[in-house]
Amino acid sequence: LMNKRAVVLYLSIILGLVLIVTGWYAASFLTYTSESVPEGFSGDRAYADVQTQVDMGPRTPGSAGHAQIREWMRTELESAGWIVEVHESERLGHPIYNIIAKRGEEPPQIILAAHYDTRFFADNDPDPAKHTEPVPGANDGASGVAVLLELARTLPADTTPTWLVFFDTEDNGRVEGWDWILGSRAFVEEVPIQPQAVVIIDMIGDAD
């Protein structure tokens, strides 16, 4: 599993980036400094969310873990007071379920996004024996989701209009019949919004 110290560090860095971005639109954030973290923001809780996802098993498209994580994310987001919608689409014959969390019907000025699916094959693993096994997805998948969920719990309700988007079917390029970033491409092509800023959170749990 990914390095816990790295998770806590990167959570703080990413939160700083988020508040700086939102500060372009909301004067209340102009006093933010890199040393300050909102009360209740927990790196330990985010790390636990990573473990929860890994315990579901691979979240490859169409798998039991893939369905389970969607329901779990919905529960966590709704518990934090967000409205949850599913953007359904299809690319290359594969169903897509992008999860959108928002606080109201106002179009977003900012989108914070991560992908939640995992890769069918660990073809970049240093151990060739694992190249045909699915990726556990602690770093590549779960870390970004954990950050967004913790932001969902701690972002102020009166912040700049923001959507949290959890992209599906992003991670299986170089697999026959698949391609990279299918979910985010479908979202961009089909959801008629024009945010001023987009922050993608991905693979933030490496030790380095």
What residue spans do the PLM features occupy?
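N-terminal Sec-pathway targeting helices
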Residues: 2-16
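Second-shell loop/turn segments in exported
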Residues: 34-40, 54-65, 86-90, 131-142, ...
